[in-house]
Amino acid sequence: QCQETMEKLWVAIAERYRDCVTVAAYDIMNEPQNNGGYEGENSYDPWNSESWHMSNQIYDRMIKAIREVDRDHIITVEGIWRISNLPDPEKAGWDNMMYQLHLYDGDDMFRKLAAGLAETAQRYNVAAYVGEFQNMHGLGICNEYGISWTTWTYKGANQDVADFFC
């Protein structure tokens, strides 16, 4: 039932904005494999292939529904912290896609993951986007790899994520 409601919502959004040139992309789900620390009865391991498969099934359903009414807008899907959990869009039948990560890592891991995102984007012929980050060197690293980016917040530029909540 939740997926049905979600699909109806995305179809309504796509119908409303399909001709709107100021809408850059549709971001289907924010951090779909993130339990947010929840470890209760219905939690799952965000690092295993089963959770990736579940997310990709939902992505597939939403992308197909959106494409029924809007063939033009970019659709972005998030691998969140790792890009390897997203499928080859051509094999999935997806087009006009942007693959996205959210990176809250230190410089070395940020660089490694950004390099992987850039390589995946080139291999799959998709746009690359870091939709959230707080690393003070992240902007430069994204630019180095030709990755589009948005910082998580404009409140600060310190390494400690706690500084962003001030």
Residue positions per predicted region:
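Extracellular glycoside hydrolase catalytic/binding regions
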Residues: 4-25, 29-152, 156, 161-166
